[in-house]
Amino acid sequence: MKPKILLTNDDGITSTGLWAAYDALAPIADVTVVAPATQQSAVGRSISIFEPIRANQVTMNGVTAYSVGGKPTDAVIIGLFALRLNPDLVVSGVNIGENLSFESIMTSGTVGAALEAANQGVPSLAFSLQVEDQGDKFDDPSRIIDRYSDAKRVVRETCERVLANGFPGKAHVINVNIPARVRGGYEITRLAEKLFYTGVEERLDPRGRPYYWIDGPLYEDAEEGTDVHAVQRGNVSITPITLDCTAYAAADELKAIFDGMHI
């Protein structure tokens, strides 16, 4: 019997990246698509608690899928607890745009969905495809085509390996980033701290009042061994991520700082 995969994303159910992942996985698994109805990039792991969530069964590309009126995390929760899919694996992506560095995984809806699945006890992988034109991240994801041949191969090979060999015991999410032009092989990496230099652009509205765009150029010189460096070299970056954000190395220092404190 084929393994079961819940497939989701943050670019929305019409995204060509989502359906590229479906095409890659359908031959090796029983895949159910449960994805946001609309674009949900950069929502991180946010969750809908002040409004109801609707999940509509739809047919796309000849496939029965579920369109969720919410965020990527909502889609995972609906798939696990409302639809009771009981997947062996949750796959999120393929995202249009790289999700590299600690900075990105904290804001990415793609990685957020994978983190939610992992927090619910389901092994998960997030896949993202680097874009050469940053504007592609903000275009209609249903119109981004003809760039998924490498991504499909990576999605299939990576998931086949994980399903055959088991999920790494000390990891909760595997974050995979695919270069726009693959020139090397697979590289096991760690998270860089940042992908972008943070900047703010101030503009004025017609009434002369300021408003702001958060923007900034990409890092060009990433440290060797990081996910950013690997993708810049044309390698596929595979980064193990854990849910435990505890800084154990700081525990003794904190104990010394707060020793003797009483309330």
Swiss-Prot record:
Enzyme class name: hydrolase
Subcellular location(s): the record lists: Cytoplasm
Q: What is its main location?
A: cytoplasm
EC no.? 3.1.3.5
Task: List keywords of the entry alphabetically.
Answer: Cytoplasm, Hydrolase, Metal-binding, Nucleotide-binding
Q: How is the cofactor bound?
A: Binds 1 divalent metal cation per subunit.
Cite the InterPro entries for this sequence. SurE, SurE-like_Pase/nucleotidase, SurE-like_sf
The disulfides recorded in the entry are none
What cofactor is needed?
A: a divalent metal cation
Q: Which domain of life is it from?
A: Archaea
Any Pfam family matching the protein = SurE
Q: Function of this protein?
A: Nucleotidase that shows phosphatase activity on nucleoside 5'-monophosphates.
- PANTHER family xref list: 5'-NUCLEOTIDASE SURE, PHOSPHATASE, PUTATIVE (AFU_ORTHOLOGUE AFUA_4G01070)-RELATED
The similarity comment for this entry is:
Belongs to the SurE nucleotidase family.
What is the protein named? 5'-nucleotidase SurE
